[in-house]
A protein has these predicted regions:
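Nucleotide-activated donor-binding/catalytic signature segment of Leloir-type glycosyltransferases, i.e.
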Residues: 234-250
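Aromatic "clamp/platform" in nucleotide-sugar-dependent glycosyltransferases that forms part
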Residues: 267
Length: 358
């Protein structure tokens, strides 16, 4: 089977997903037509196996610019025409999703086309309501051109269908989950509440800081942000709050092992890989109740969802009063949940079944 992937941003979560998917479906031929971002690794092709080839999409860019977008569509059409016998066309992220579905319609590939948003554009809270309505309109038009939409979580599917997007299926994001359970860590003194990610508006560092400041001077608790970003200044570092700065993937794992409870303050997600990685390490979850986050928490069984700072603070106070055995049990349930519902093995099975429908 020949699978062609198209993305304007071969970086971050899209890159991780494609590395995982192409390695899981290693008997298939994959061709990736890609655009670059500032955080696209040098020699990105070395991250993929021998079953993958890459084509650089030089006109691709994130922002809506009609002239540049027309050039990107023309280049994409040219590249797709050079690839014989395409079995599956899979589009990743919003811009590739729009241009790719137009191209699919023009080339007669609409029934072989799948679109994976990696986070729905109109879920964004960093744009005006008017712009969100514009994004919904664009998605509806593109949806009519071609293909099936793949939501990476049930809550993302619900958001899509509630806004008039049709022909949506769910395949949960997945990660490599070790067959052997992790060594569960007794919560320390202080208990470390930590998160992983770029410090951006989406991740809501203001809320993270607000929660942390409530516990200022309380030596029972510490807060850790693993990562860096343009809004680092919104997190007030102190003896209680540490920001690691940019670290390697191996260092991320080492820091994450030090965390007792994974804390997310995100405003929106698709289905966050960092949360799944924390679950695979047996971490209890304390997550904001946004799209994507809500799919990972079984309330009271592997952690808690909260709506605002007051609820988040109350949940931390509850965890501080809980016995170490209770916190360990929350972590064990996290591992079982990720192993059952969010593994690469399950993702591979579901994608194979989806592609075989064609």
């Amino acid at each position: 089977m020949k699978i062609v992937h198209v993305t304007e941003c071969l970086a971050g979560g899209v890159l991780t997903f494609l590395v995982n998917l192409t390695s899981q479906l290693d008997q298939e031929e994959h061709i990736i037509i890609y655009g670059k971002r500032d955080n696209t690794p040098e020699n990105v092709e070395t991250l993929f196996g021998d079953n993958v080839s890459l084509i650089y999409w030089k006109s691709a860019q994130r922002e809506i610019r009609p002239g540049q977008d027309f050039a990107a569509l023309r280049e994409l059409l040219h590249d797709l025409k050079q690839i014989p016998d395409i079995d599956v066309l899979q589009l990743h992220s919003s811009k590739a999703g729009v241009l790719g579905r137009v191209a699919a319609r023009l080339l007669g590939l609409q029934k072989r086309t799948f679109y994976l948003p990696h986070g729905v554009s109109f879920a964004r809270q960093d744009v005006s309501p008017k712009k969100r309505q514009f994004y919904i309109l664009i998605e509806k038009v593109a949806n009519a051109f071609a293909g099936t939409v793949i939501a990476c979580s049930s809550s993302e599917r619900d958001l899509l269908t509630a806004n008039g997007i049709k022909n949506v299926v769910v395949i949960n994001n997945g990660i490599a989950v070790p067959d052997k359970e992790p060594v569960y860590k007794q919560p320390g003194k202080p208990i470390v509440f930590g998160t992983v990610g770029r410090i951006t508006f989406q991740k809501n560092p203001q809320l993270f800081n607000q929660i942390a400041r409530h516990f200022q001077g309380d030596d029972r608790v510490k807060f850790l942000w693993i990562g860096d970003g343009e809004l680092r200044h919104e997190i007030q570092e102190s003896g209680q709050v540490q920001v690691t700065g940019w670290v390697t993937p191996d260092e991320v794992q080492n820091y994450l092992k030090q965390v007792d409870v994974y804390l997310s303050t995100s405003l929106w997600e698709g289905l966050p890989l960092s949360v799944l990685e924390a679950m695979a390490l047996g971490k209890p979850l304390l997550l904001s109740d946004c799209v994507g986050n809500v799919d990972t928490v079984e309330q009271g069984a592997n952690g808690f969802l909260y709506h605002d700072a007051a609820e988040g603070i109350a949940s931390i106070q509850k965890l501080l009063k809980a016995s170490p055995d209770k916190i360990l049990q929350l972590g064990k349930t996290s591992y079982k949940r990720v192993a059952n519902d969010f593994s690469l093995r399950r993702l591979r099975q579901q994608y194979r079944a989806l592609y075989n429908i064609i």
